[in-house]
Structure formats: C-alpha cells, structure tokens
C-alpha cells in the first residue's frame, strides 16, 4: 500500500479473494486497454504478475458503457476520505458507503444525487456578488470535490467558462501603441491571476523556481510519478493575454487550461500537471507586494533562462516520454523560438500559436466556402502581430503551402501584418520580433501610402490600399475595427470576413452587432469572446461563432466539417461551445487516424480508431463506487 503522489489517495494491491469474477474481468480488460494507449498508470498484469496482452478492441463495448461503474479502491475512512477531493462525494455517499467508511455520523441523513448537488452548488455560486468571488467559490469547490466541480462546470458551461478559464476580471488600462481611445472605459481582465498572492489559500500544481534549478527532477517527483501523467501545462507567466507578466500567479492560467482539457477533451484531471516556471518578474506591482509568493527578483533572461527551460524540457522528455508538453502564455520573445527548438525532439504544443491558429483556420475554411472562393485567393490583414497573430498567420501560410501548393513566398504575399510599428515592412528589420520577418511587405510597395505623425501606416490605410477580404484582430485594442474601417472593407468585398479575436469581451476589436450593421449584415464573423446573436438582413437571429482554442485538440478539417454555416450561410462559422465534448471526439478520431495514415503512431496498430473507442477513454465527472481496502 502507498500514497499516490498524484492525488493523495491510498492505493493497495487489490485483494483478489474479495473480487467477484465479473469485477476481475472488468479490471483486467480495462488494464489491457489503458496499458496499450498509455491513458492510465494501472499495471496491466494478471494475478501472477504476468503482463496482459495488448488486445486493442477486446471488451471495447464493455469499457464504453461500464467504465463509470468500476469501483475505486481506497483505505481512507472518515474525515480523511471527506478531505480527499478526488474521492469525496459529500452528501452523495450512499448509505452502504457511509456505513463501510465510517461516515454515517459525519454527514446529514439525506443522500443527494449529483444532479441535486450541482443545482445547490450553482445556486451558491450565483449568490456570490462578483466574478472574483465566484472564482474563489469554484476554486474552493474543486479543492473539496473534483467530480462535483467538473460536473457543475459541464452542466453550466456557458456561465462558468469565462470564470475558470480567464480567471477572472479586474480593471486594467490597456497600453498599446495605437491611437488612444479615451472614450472607452477601462477593461476587466484576470483579477484572480493578478491577486494570486493575496487570495492564495492552498498549493495546487507545481512551482519550479530557478533558484532551485539543481533540484528540478526531485521537485517534479514531489508532484506526480512519471507514469501518472499524460499532459503537462507549463507557463513562465510572461505573456498572459491582456495583463502581461504575472510572475507566480501564472499558475492559475495553467490550471485554467488544464480545466479546459478535462471539460472539453475528457482528460482525467488527475493525469494533468500544471507547472509554473518561476524565473522572477518584471512587474513592479508584484515586486513591491509584501505578500508576493514568487521569486522576488527581476525576470531572468538570456542564457540562464534558456538553460533552465532546457533542463526542465530534458526532464520531461526523459522521465515523462508519454506526456504532451503544452507551452502556455510564454512571452513573445520566447514562444516561437522555444517551440521551434523543442518541437522536433519531443511532443510539445504552443496553444497561443498553434491552438488558436488551428481554430481560426477551421473557421476560415468554413467562411471561404460560404463566399464560394479559395483560401489562396484571399487578402488577409492581421491586426496585432504578437504570439497569437504570428501563430495564426504561420498556420494559414502552412495550410496554403500544403493544401494549395503555394511556395513560401507566394503564401507570404497574401498577408498584411500590423503591429506596434504599424504595417510591418522591410524598413522595420531592426525592430522586428522573432518570426515577424517572415511576413513583412517590401517597403517599396507602400512608399505612397499615408502615414501618421510617427511615420506608421495604420489599419485604415491598409484596408483602403490592400482591400482585404479577411480582417483578423489579435491586438487587445478595443474598438479598433470601427465603423470607418468596416465600411471601407465592405466597399470592396461582398462578404467581408471579420474576426475580432481579442478576449475577454471588453478587449475585442469590435462588437459583432456593430460590424453586422456597418456591413449591412454581409460580414462573416467569429470572435474570441462570447457575444449575443446578431440579426441578418432577413431579420433572422444567428449566433456568432466564438473562436476558442479550448475547442481544439487538432484536426482543422474535422472541425470545419461541423460548421453550421455549411447548411445555412447565415449560421455560425463554428459549432456551439456546448457541443465541445462531442466535437473533441470527432476531431480526435480524425487526428488519430491521420497519424496512422502518416506512420506517426507509436501504437503498432493498423485498424482505424472509432468515435466509440475514443469516447471510452474520456473521463466523466460521475461518482464511481468505492471499495474499502483492508
């Protein structure tokens, strides 16, 4: 018997004499399946310790329907069991479980269903007066009862998603070197992240400080054993959208992303590790905060930073070879180059660059089908060319090369990219960030274009001169896609494609209702934040597609095929967020089978994946029976 580093639950060798034959079969068939696909750390052995055969589809139907009925074995009893969030059911413990685990006197008499508990918890959350208070409530709920937390979130996804994913809101003045908008109010973003050290109650996730870099492997083992991990979400907290460098508080953005993997993809939350690489902070508010919990020093950069990240990635590659490494909210100076360095040698993914790009590309594929045109014939303006903007452009360029057969130079010429210096051209080579040089226009092309008093070519001038068919916003500059810009674009394009992607809502470049009015209902839109439906010229309300990397595991084509607009041009470019688990299954099947086709799978199989098979591996927030280990 030992205590699991992953969850604190007690595990023990299961007493075979106490297991009925059907239960043994369930454990064994489940172990076979999990051992093959590396989705669980259970030892796939028989009673004699002999490894079980890796039969791929054996008992698949049983697993798909009975996975939530298999018992969990534990030696915890009484308050120790109630204090274990991965096992606690609160009022959901059955009478038999209360008797077995010594809980009868520790709980009120009535046994409540998970549905009843969700309704009560949602009512309690709604009574909280502010987004921060709601976030604190949900965080506390997760610390008490993991199943109830995720069940609540799935049932009320639209209500809680913005709270748990961009946790949560606070007044912030946007500082961006484009024309000021004094008429706009301060925006709200990331209050829980900014107040992390103030509201902190108990540790969650892994904190790797550069001050202890010689103990990285030891510290990682303190969190979870290598075989207990499928996914590692890591951030250095420098580039958190809208609020920038947040030091150790970036742990919350990593945890928020981990929550989305569970809610959207069905990944077992106990098999996800959220990590913050604490290399200091350049945020003066944090450095001067006496309660700040992170490393109190200026952010480490250069060679020392690279060596620290390399040591971490080496440990992940060597000790966690089956785990995917997810880079989250790294700064613009590091995101692209770190991905380029580690992508060829280990399974890694930059959400801000690749995830966002994949969803945008899926929406664009849907949009150009509505316009009855080809992606290669578009003229694309990207407004805001940081990590996300660059990732989107790079993703589209790659698609143009692979699918349309364009050369790299031909694909580059469809873009006009705007950042702090205005339109990026060959005259800006000294001030470009890594990767931006791949998308600059030749300065001679724009010699006659109008410039502002600082010599920059702005958005409106680019729209007038380039006549874009697609306008993508990643600037976090609220209101940048104003009436003049949208009407100018609509002069030259019958169905302008306009994606104000900055989030949260108050940072979006435009309100879809305004864009709809300014383009006479002809714009095809998708946003990075939720907005109310808009009314088309025929008077019909239709939902605006919300582009969110929380929907994507991979598979642009699979996602695009689900677009409602393919049946009705006035409908959304992407399916609703409430369908995210269903969508994730379809996308995962497409990606898994593509990996088989390209010889990239390490599973040694040739038979195709099915939706039922993928669905059987999704973790569901349900109460499984508990069995006591003597």
Regions found by a protein language model. Give the residues of each.
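Metallocofactor- and cofactor-centric catalytic cores in central/energy metabolism, strongly enriched
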Residues: 36-376, 391, 395-396, 403-404, ...
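Conserved alpha-helical scaffold flanking the Walker A/P-loop in AAA+ ATPase domains
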Residues: 455-464
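Beta1/beta-strand and adjacent pyrophosphate-binding region of the FAD-binding site
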Residues: 381
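Glycine-rich Rossmann-fold phosphate-binding loop(s) that bind the pyrophosphate
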Residues: 236, 384-386
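N-terminal chloroplast transit peptides
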Residues: 1-37
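Acidic/histidine-rich catalytic neighborhood
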Residues: 387, 422-423, 428-430, 435
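Cysteine protease catalytic core and zymogen-processing segment of caspase-like enzymes
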Residues: 513-515
């Amino acid at each position: 018997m030992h205590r699991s580093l992953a969850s604190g639950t007690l595990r023990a060798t299961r007493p075979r004499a106490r297991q009925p034959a059907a239960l043994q079969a369930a454990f064994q068939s489940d172990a076979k399946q999990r051992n093959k696909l590396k989705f669980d750390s259970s030892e796939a052995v028989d009673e004699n310790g002999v490894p079980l055969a890796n039969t791929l589809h054996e008992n698949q139907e049983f697993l798909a329907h009975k996975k939530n009925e298999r018992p969990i074995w534990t030696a915890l009893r009484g308050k120790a069991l109630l204090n274990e969030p991965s096992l606690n059911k609160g009022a959901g413990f059955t009478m038999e479980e209360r008797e077995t685990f010594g809980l009868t006197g520790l709980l009120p008499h009535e046994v409540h269903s998970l549905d009843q508990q969700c309704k009560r918890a949602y009512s309690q959350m709604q009574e909280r007066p502010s987004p921060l208070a709601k976030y604190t409530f949900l965080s506390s709920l997760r610390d008490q009862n993991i199943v109830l937390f995720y069940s609540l979130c799935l049932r009320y996804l639209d209500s809680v998603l913005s709270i748990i994913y961009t946790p949560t809101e606070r007044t912030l003045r946007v500082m961006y070197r484009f024309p000021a908008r004094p008429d706009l109010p301060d925006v709200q973003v990331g209050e829980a992240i900014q107040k992390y050290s103030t509201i902190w109650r108990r540790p969650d996730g892994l904190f790797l400080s550069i001050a202890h870099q010689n103990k990285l492997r030891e510290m990682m083992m303190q969190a979870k054993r290598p075989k207990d991990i499928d996914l590692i979400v890591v951030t250095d907290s420098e580039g958190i959208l809208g609020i920038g460098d947040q030091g150790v508080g970036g742990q919350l953005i990593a945890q928020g992303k981990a929550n989305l993997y569970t809610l959207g993809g069905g990944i077992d939350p106990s098999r996800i590790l959220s990590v913050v690489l604490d290399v200091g902070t350049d945020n003066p508010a944090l450095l001067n905060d006496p309660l700040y919990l992170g490393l109190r020093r200026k952010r480490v950069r250069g060679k020392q930073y690279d060596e620290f990240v390399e040591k971490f990635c080496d440990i992940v590659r060597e000790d966690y070879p089956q785990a995917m490494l997810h880079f989250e909210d790294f700064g613009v100076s590091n995101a692209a180059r770190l991905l380029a360095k580690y992508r060829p040698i280990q399974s890694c993914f930059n959400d801000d660059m690749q995830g966002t790009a994949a969803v945008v590309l899926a929406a664009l594929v849907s949009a150009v089908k509505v316009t009855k045109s080809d992606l290669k014939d578009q003229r694309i303006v990207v407004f805001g060319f940081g990590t996300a903007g660059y990732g989107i452009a790079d993703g589209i360029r790659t698609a143009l090369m692979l699918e349309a057969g364009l050369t790299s130079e031909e694909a580059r010429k469809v873009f006009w990219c705007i950042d702090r210096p205005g339109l990026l051209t060959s005259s800006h080579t000294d001030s470009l960030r890594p990767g931006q040089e791949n998308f600059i226009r030749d300065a001679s092309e724009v010699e006659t274009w109008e410039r502002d008093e600082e010599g920059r070519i702005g958005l409106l001038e680019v729209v007038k001169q380039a006549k874009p068919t697609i306008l993508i916003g990643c600037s976090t500059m609220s209101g940048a896609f104003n009436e003049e810009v949208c009407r100018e674009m609509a002069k030259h394009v019958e169905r302008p494609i306009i994606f104000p992607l900055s989030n949260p809502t108050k940072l979006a470049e435009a309100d879809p209702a305004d864009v709809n009015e300014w383009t006479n209902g002809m714009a095809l839109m998708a946003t990075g934040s939720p907005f109310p439906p808009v009314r088309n010229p025929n008077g019909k309300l239709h939902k605006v597609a919300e582009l969110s990397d929380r929907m994507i595991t991979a598979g642009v084509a699979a996602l695009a095929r689900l677009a409602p607009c393919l049946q009705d041009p006035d409908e959304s470019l992407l399916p609703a967020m409430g369908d995210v688990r269903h969508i994730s299954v379809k996308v995962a099947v497409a990606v898994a089978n593509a990996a088989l086709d390209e010889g990239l799978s390490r599973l040694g199989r040739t038979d195709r994946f099915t939706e039922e098979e993928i669905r059987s591996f999704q973790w569901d927030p349900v109460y499984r029976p508990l069995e006591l280990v003597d």
